[in-house]
Design a protein with these regions (language model features):
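Conserved beta-strand-loop-beta-strand hairpin that lines the nucleotide-binding pocket
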Residues: 1-12, 57-154, 182-190, 219, ...
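Bergerat-fold GHKL ATPase/HATPase_c domain
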Residues: 1-51, 155-181, 310-311
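C-terminal catalytic subdomain
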Residues: 2-4, 16-21, 223-229, 233, ...
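Short acidic, Gly/Ser-rich segments with clustered Asp/Glu that frequently serve as metal-coordination loops
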Residues: 90, 194-201, 303-308
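N-terminal entry segment of metal-dependent catalytic domains or homologous docking segments
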Residues: 145-195, 200, 206-207, 280-282, ...
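PP2C/PPM family metal-dependent serine/threonine protein phosphatase catalytic domain
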Residues: 156-175, 222-230, 257-288, 292, ...
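Catalytic core of PPM/PP2C metal-dependent serine/threonine phosphatase domains
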Residues: 200-266, 284, 333, 345-346
Length: 347
C-alpha cells in the first residue's frame, strides 16, 4: 500500500533560532550533531551539514546584520532541510554571489558556492529593497537539503511538494494537519485545521489518512471526514487531486481556509463556503481546472495571512515548492494560531 505522508509525523521543526551573532552557531552545531547521530547520518554528511550551517549563520550575521533565523526541518522522503531566512537587503547579483571569490563584505567569498556544493539540493530566493517606502518583505531565503536515503523518489514522480506546519508557540499539540499521497500519476492531499488549537484541535484532525486510501472524489472525502468528526471539536478542510495523465486539478473545501492556483505568472485566490466539518456546513465548494506544463497549487490554514500576491514575492512561485512553503509560512504566518501550508507543483 502506498504511504500516506502525515505532517504530524513527517514534517517536523527540529530547531529554530535567531542568528544575531556568530555565537548562534554553537547551539546550532550542538543540535545538529545530536540529531544526525540519532538518525544514523554518515560522518561525511554530518560534516557537510555542519559546514553549511556555519556558512548560513555567517551570511546572516554579515549580510543581514543578524536580522535572520536558522531552522532545521525533517521532511517527507527522509530528508533534513537547513533553512536560513533573513530580513536583510537581499542579493543584488545572485549568480555572481555563487561564484567563489565574489564578496560584498571583503571576505573570501566562498559562502553560497560552498553551500550549493556541500548540500544534496540547494534553493535560493532573494528580494531586494527598491525604496525606503517599500513595505513588502526583503531579504534572502536559502534551503539546503540533505537526503538521508541514497535516492530521492520525488524526481521520478513528476510531482514536487512542500509542507510547512507549526503549532501555536511551537507547543506540543498542533490542530493543523496535512495528509498527502502519491499514486502513479495522481497526487492527492487532505489539509485540515482543527477548531481552535491545542490537544482537542489535534485530536479532531488525527487518524484521517485512510480517507486518502479509500478515495472516490474530493467531495466524497470531505463527506466521510464530516461523519467521522461528529462529537469532536470539528475542523475546516481542503482536499485536492492532481491528475498528470489528464492534466486536471480538482479542489474542494469547507470553512475558513484558502487555496491559491498559480499558472502563467497569474495567481487565483480561492475561498470556500463557511462551515465546520463534524458540526454544520453548507454545500462544499469545488473547483476544477486544467493546467499546462507549469502549475502550482497552494493550500493554507487561517494561520497564514492572506494579504499577499505575486507582487509581494516576485519570482517565488517558480521556486521549489518546499522553499515556497517555508517562505510563506515564516513570513506570512500568524503567531496567534497554528500555521500550515501545502504547496504542490508540476513542471
Amino acid at each position: 500500500m502506498t504511504k500516506v505522508f502525515d505532517s504530524a509525523k513527517d514534517c517536523k521543526l527540529l530547531f529554530n533560532n535567531a542568528t544575531q551573532t556568530e555565537s548562534s552557531l554553537i547551539l546550532l552545531r550542538s543540535k545538529l550533531v545530536a540529531i544526525t547521530q540519532r538518525l544514523g547520518v554518515s560522518a561525511l554528511k554530518q560534516e557537510n551539514m555542519l559546514l553549511v550551517a556555519s556558512e548560513l549563520v555567517s551570511n546572516n550575521v554579515k549580510h543581514a546584520a543578524g536580522r535572520g533565523m536558522i531552522q532545521l526541518w525533517k521532511q517527507p522522503g527522509n530528508v533534513l532541510d537547513l533553512l536560513s531566512l533573513d530580513y536583510g537587503p537581499g542579493i543584488a547579483n545572485l549568480a555572481g554571489a555563487e561564484v567563489d571569490g565574489f564578496s560584498s563584505v571583503s571576505t573570501l567569498g566562498k559562502g553560497l558556492g560552498a553551500i550549493r556544493r556541500l548540500s544534496d539540493e540547494c534553493y535560493i530566493y532573494t528580494q531586494q529593497q527598491r525604496s525606503e517606502q517599500q513595505k513588502k518583505w526583503t531579504g534572502t531565503v536559502i534551503m539546503a537539503r540533505f537526503h538521508l536515503d541514497k535516492e530521492s523518489k520525488e524526481a521520478k514522480s513528476g510531482f514536487k511538494f512542500g509542507l510547512y506546519s507549526r503549532s501555536l508557540s511551537d507547543e506540543r499539540y498542533n490542530g493543523d494537519r496535512i495528509y498527502l499521497k502519491r499514486v502513479g500519476k495522481m497526487l492527492r492531499w487532505l489539509h485540515l485545521d482543527g477548531l481552535g488549537h491545542g490537544e482537542e484541535a489535534q485530536a479532531a484532525t488525527a487518524d484521517l489518512a485512510m480517507h486518502l486510501q479509500n478515495y472516490e472524489s474530493p467531495e466524497a472525502i470531505l463527506e466521510t471526514v464530516d461523519h467521522q468528526l461528529v462529537n469532536t471539536r470539528g475542523a475546516v478542510a481542503i482536499t485536492g487531486e492532481i491528475d498528470l495523465a489528464k492534466y486536471n486539478l480538482r479542489v474542494s473545501g469547507v470553512g475558513d481556509m484558502t487555496a491559491h492556483i498559480y499558472d502563467q505568472e497569474q495567481i487565483q485566490h480561492i475561498t470556500f463556503a463557511p462551515g465546520i466539518l463534524g458540526r454544520e456546513h453548507r454545500t462544499m465548494t469545488g473547483v476544477q481546472a486544467e493546467f499546462g506544463k507549469k502549475h502550482v497549487i497552494i493550500t493554507a490554514s487561517d494561520g497564514i495571512r492572506r494579504n499577499w500576491d505575486t507582487s509581494n514575492f516576485s519570482g517565488l512561485f517558480n521556486q521549489h515548492p518546499q522553499l515556497i512553503a517555508y517562505t510563506l509560512g515564516n513570513i506570512m504566518g500568524r503567531i496567534s494560531d497554528d500555521q500550515s501550508v501545502c504547496v504542490c507543483s508540476i513542471g
